Amino acid sequence: MEIAVIGNSEFILGFRLAGIRKTYTAENDEKLLESVNSVLADGQVGILVLNSSDMERLPRRLRTTLENSVKPTVIALGGEEGGLSMRERIKRSVGVDLWK
C-alpha cells in the first residue's frame, strides 16, 4: 500500500521531502478532480492525504464518497475538518478502536 498526497505545491512539498512519491499538484478545481479520480482508480493507494480546504472544493457527491472510503482511507489535514474524526476513520479502516 502506498500513500498519495494531493494539494498545492506548498502542501505536498513536505510529503515529498519525507519520501512520498505519489504526489499530485492540484492548483485548480479541474486538476483537483482529475487527481482525486486518478488516485481512486489506483489500487495501490491505501491512504490519500489532502488539504481540508481542497476537500471542501470537491463536489458534494465525491466528498461523500471520500468520507466513506475505506480503501483508500482519506485524511484531510488543516483547518477544522467536518465529518468523521481521525479516530473514527482508523476504526472504520482497520475494524478496531485502537484507543481502547
UniProtKB/Swiss-Prot annotation:
It comes from Methanoregula boonei (strain DSM 21154 / JCM 14090 / 6A8). GO terms for cellular component: plasma membrane. Belongs to the V-ATPase F subunit family. Keywords: ATP synthesis, Cell membrane, Hydrogen ion transport, Ion transport, Membrane, Transport. It is a peripheral membrane protein. Component of the A-type ATP synthase that produces ATP from ADP in the presence of a proton gradient across the membrane. Gene3D superfamilies: ATPase, V1 complex, subunit F (3.40.50.10580). One of its GO terms (molecular function) is ATP binding. This is A-type ATP synthase subunit F. One of its GO terms (biological process) is proton motive force-driven plasma membrane ATP synthesis. Has multiple subunits with at least A(3), B(3), C, D, E, F, H, I and proteolipid K(x). The gene is atpF. It is found in: Cell membrane. Its main location: membrane.
